[in-house]
């Protein structure tokens, strides 16, 4: 799901984030490990504010954390 299709500025659903990563042949676990984190660390950003993890995920999607989680910023 690309932000230009979203007009209501709601946070992305966690399944949409995971799906977008999958489309890019990535997973949260792989992304975490490639950033020297535990394979489960990035999952925390799906449910609560975690700026470091949010940035890693957003960068992987070519976006900003504010695009994905507008309610947190």
From Swiss-Prot:
Q: Which GO terms describe its cellular component?
A: host cell cytoplasm
Q: State what this protein does.
A: Switches off the PcM promoter thereby blocking expression of the major repressor Repc (latency factor) and favoring transcription from the early promoter (Pe) and hence viral transposition and lytic development. Negatively regulates the early promoter (Pe) thereby controlling its own expression and keeping the level of early genes expression independent of the viral genome copy number.
Which family does the record claim for this protein?
A: Belongs to the ner transcriptional regulatory family.
Q: Which organism is it from?
A: Escherichia phage D108
Originating gene: ner
What keywords is this UniProt entry annotated with?
Answer: DNA-binding, Early protein, Host cytoplasm, Pyruvate, Repressor, Transcription, Transcription regulation
Name the Gene Ontology molecular function terms of this record: DNA binding
What this protein is called in its record is Negative regulator of transcription
Q: Name one Pfam family in it.
A: HTH_35
| Subcellular location(s) per record | Host cytoplasm
What the record says about the induction of its expression is: Expressed in the early phase of the viral replicative cycle. Early gene transcription is repressed by viral Repc (latency) and favored by viral Ner protein (lytic development).
Residues annotated as DNA-binding are 28-47
Is the keyword Nuclease in the record?
no
Read off the SUPFAM superfamilies from this record: lambda repressor-like DNA-binding domains
